[in-house]
Curated annotation (Swiss-Prot):
Its EC number is 2.8.1.-. [4Fe-4S] cluster binds at residues 122, 125, 213. This is tRNA-cytidine(32) 2-sulfurtransferase. Binds 1 [4Fe-4S] cluster per subunit. The cluster is chelated by three Cys residues, the fourth Fe has a free coordination site that may bind a sulfur atom transferred from the persulfide of IscS. A motif (PP-loop motif) lies at residues 47-52. Keywords: 4Fe-4S, ATP-binding, Cytoplasm, Iron, Iron-sulfur, Magnesium, Metal-binding, Nucleotide-binding, RNA-binding, Transferase, tRNA processing, tRNA-binding. Its cofactor is Mg(2+); [4Fe-4S] cluster. It catalyses: cytidine(32) in tRNA + S-sulfanyl-L-cysteinyl-[cysteine desulfurase] + AH2 + ATP = 2-thiocytidine(32) in tRNA + L-cysteinyl-[cysteine desulfurase] + A + AMP + diphosphate + H(+). The lineage of its organism: Bacteria, Pseudomonadati, Pseudomonadota, Gammaproteobacteria, Enterobacterales. One of its GO terms (molecular function) is 4 iron, 4 sulfur cluster binding. It comes from Escherichia coli O6:H1 (strain CFT073 / ATCC 700928 / UPEC).
Length: 311
């Protein structure tokens, strides 16, 4: 019995460290991009997946000690997909005492009616879902819409656009919505997916499957995700370095004439960003930028679904 108690204490200690890391990552992202301000009413989009559960949990945690006052309202869109467990989210949110709204819209039926059998439904479904969430944000008086995309999602989007779209475009931590009426934020922008997965496992969130509509995962995105996971295993620090690169863009050393006035360079122009090194090679640090050793990776791997008692 004593040994079991010691194991539980160790698991709880490791979970606390993991939660502190996620809390620090979210706090830094909020500060860097001014995501949340005094008096904000944040609409937290809750899908029932590990990412949105984690986002809600960390935001609730930060809310208790933040130097500013802000409120949260969780919103789930019930799209009437077959097999969707309607009771799961209301029961979970009522247990937490979190304000919430379940929006019921049969977008599944609309998509099935409009899209021929065998064709991808994701594009239309996404547009319908986005419009409903924007409308709901207005109805609730929300000042910000929080989405659960994390660092890996942002990098995947960058490489998708580079490999298939021919542009360097990622997923913004904060930006105006496409209808120009709402501010969309991604508080998990600095969080690693593997940390979120461990946290979700340890907290035993009631996960709802994401493919109830029967759609297939985006093959191109899956290829990119597999590539990044392989790099993360084989080249420690590469993922951190790539994300750091997204925060240190040097337009003068790229080729976009909209971002830098190359035509305006004449004799007598100032040296910009170190100038052109011509035949000299740029010095590259031995340790990848932004990378820190995983000091407690083995300990964190011990977190499993059986740590239900940790709150």
């Amino acid at each position: 019995m004593q040994e079991n108690q010691q194991i539980t204490k160790k698991e709880q200690y490791n979970l606390n460290k993991l939660q502190k890391r996620l809390r620090r990552n979210v706090g830094e992202a909020i500060a860097d991009f001014n995501m949340i301000e005094e008096g904000d009413r944040i609409m937290v989009c809750l899908s029932g997946g590990k990412d949105s559960y984690t986002m809600l949990e960390i935001l609730r945690n930060l809310q208790q000690s933040a130097p500013i006052n802000f409120s949260l309202v969780a919103v789930n869109l019930d799209q009437k997909q077959p097999g969707f467990p309607e009771h799961v989210l209301p029961e979970y949110l009522e247990t937490l005492g979190v304000e919430y709204k379940i929006v019921e819209e049969n977008t599944y039926g609309i998509v099935k009616e409009k899209i021929p059998e065998g064709k991808t439904t994701c594009s239309l479904c996404s547009r319908l879902r986005r419009g409903i969430l924007y409308r709901t944000a207005t109805e609730l008086g929300a000042t910000k819409i929080a989405l659960g995309h994390h660092r890996d999602d942002i990098l995947q989007t960058l490489f998708l656009n580079m490999f298939y779209g021919g542009k360097m475009k990622g997923m913004p931590p904060k930006l105006m919505s496409d209808d120009g009426k709402h501010i969309v934020i991604r508080p998990l922008a600095y969080c690693r997916e593997k940390d979120i997965q461990r946290f979700a496992d340890a907290k035993a969130f009631p996960i709802i499957p994401c493919n109830l509509c029967g759609s297939q995962p985006n093959l191109q995105r899956q290829v990119i995700a597999d590539m990044l996971r392989d790099w993360d295993k084989r080249y420690p620090g590469r993922i951190e370095t790539m994300f750091s690169a997204m925060q240190n863009v040097v337009p003068s050393h790229l080729c976009d004439t909209n971002l830098f006035d190359f035509k305006g360079i004449t004799h007598g122009s100032e040296v910009v960003n170190g100038g052109d090194l011509a035949f000299d090679r740029e010095e590259i640090p031995l340790q990848p930028a932004g990378w820190q050793p995983e000091e407690d990776e083995n300990q964190l791997d011990e977190l499993r679904l059986n740590v239900v008692e940790v709150k």
